Amino acid sequence: MQFHSSSALITPFKKDLSVDEAAYEALIKRQIFQGMDACVPVGTTGESATLTHKEHMRCIEIAIETCKNTKTPSNSRMKVLAGVGSNATSESLSLAKFAQKIGADAILCVSPYYNRPTQQGLFEHYKTIAQSVEIPVMLYDVPSRTGVSIEVPTALKLFREIPNIKAIKEASGSLKRVTELHYHEKDFKIFSGEDSLNHSIMFSGGCGVISVTGNLMPNLISQMVNCALKLEYQQALEIQNKLFHLHQALFVETNPIPIKMAMHLAGLIENPSYRLPLVAPSKETIQLLEKTLQQYEVIA
């Protein structure tokens, strides 16, 4: 996985709640032009749980096509880490095979939600998916959403026994987990999945981030990651601190509710539309977002 900075892309909808493909392509191009190494379509932030199977595949396809046809400022190609998560192993399997077939660089697979499998069940789930493809696989641990954690011994076993399981997205909120994983396996790539901990994870063995805030501020997220990779601790910390209030504001309600509204307020998407059961943010949240974006000079 030859990338470090990436954004968990939102999925823009039209007023009729169909996917706004033109807006989606424009958002991806903005990521490319502002220095991100990779994009992550149809993860949690992309509202994958309320997309149809066909829509899910189409979003992956748009991301791959856009990255293939749009060069970065350094004349390279932005990578695509395709979200293939589902609470049904068979559906994740289908999405993983599709992503590989059309050219995804790697896949991100969240633990099955609602089912609450045992650790053996998690192992078999990830093993089955990883062995169905040849491209790299990133585990995704976010117990606040899935109801179950990939325990450290399970994650290490998957990394050691399945050759193309290369990385894990850490959204558990536990730096202890990060340090433990890195201590036992230096080559197991750890990506921050929690913007408030980006700096801390990068300096505790992490090698990159998958950011929600990056939808809005890809240049600053990219700069912070690059500073961390060069071991420029203080410079990276200054950027992390600069983003503190924005990180806070974007998670006052369930993600991706605030980030989609912020993107709308910033003029980056036309419609801040959500599919039920997600609904628009409260008036208080909108006011907070407006105030925060003004502080960052995103809006007047």
From Swiss-Prot:
Is Membrane tagged as a keyword? no
Quickly give the catalysed reaction: L-aspartate 4-semialdehyde + pyruvate = (2S,4S)-4-hydroxy-2,3,4,5-tetrahydrodipicolinate + H2O + H(+)
Instruction: Cite the Gene3D superfamilies for this sequence.
Output: Aldolase class I (3.20.20.70)
The active site is formed by 140 (proton donor/acceptor), 169 (schiff-base intermediate with substrate)
Q: What does the UniProt function comment say about this protein?
A: Catalyzes the condensation of (S)-aspartate-beta-semialdehyde [(S)-ASA] and pyruvate to 4-hydroxy-tetrahydrodipicolinate (HTPA).
Q: Which CDD domains match?
A: DHDPS (cd00950)
Classification of source organism: Bacteria, Pseudomonadati, Campylobacterota, Epsilonproteobacteria, Campylobacterales
Cell compartments where the protein resides:
Cytoplasm
Output this protein's name. 4-hydroxy-tetrahydrodipicolinate synthase
Query: Which Pfam families does the protein's record reference?
Result: DHDPS (PF00701)
Q: Where is this site: Part of a proton relay during catalysis?
A: 44, 114
Q: Can the keyword Amino-acid biosynthesis be found in this entry's annotation?
A: yes
- Positions binding pyruvate in this chain are 45, 210
Q: Which EC number(s) does UniProt give? A: 4.3.3.7
| NCBIfam families xrefs | dapA
- Subunit details: Homotetramer; dimer of dimers.
Q: What pathway does the UniProt record associate with this protein?
A: Amino-acid biosynthesis; L-lysine biosynthesis via DAP pathway; (S)-tetrahydrodipicolinate from L-aspartate: step 3/4
Signal peptide, first to last residue: none
Q: Which organism is it from?
A: Helicobacter pylori (strain P12)
Name a single GO cellular component. Answer: cytosol
Domain of life per record? Bacteria
Entry's family note: Belongs to the DapA family.
Q: Which GO terms describe its molecular function?
A: 4-hydroxy-tetrahydrodipicolinate synthase activity
> Which keywords describe this protein according to UniProt?
Amino-acid biosynthesis, Cytoplasm, Diaminopimelate biosynthesis, Lyase, Lysine biosynthesis, Schiff base
Task: Check the record and name the PROSITE patterns matching this protein.
Answer: DHDPS_2 (PS00666)
- GO terms for biological process? diaminopimelate biosynthetic process; lysine biosynthetic process via diaminopimelate
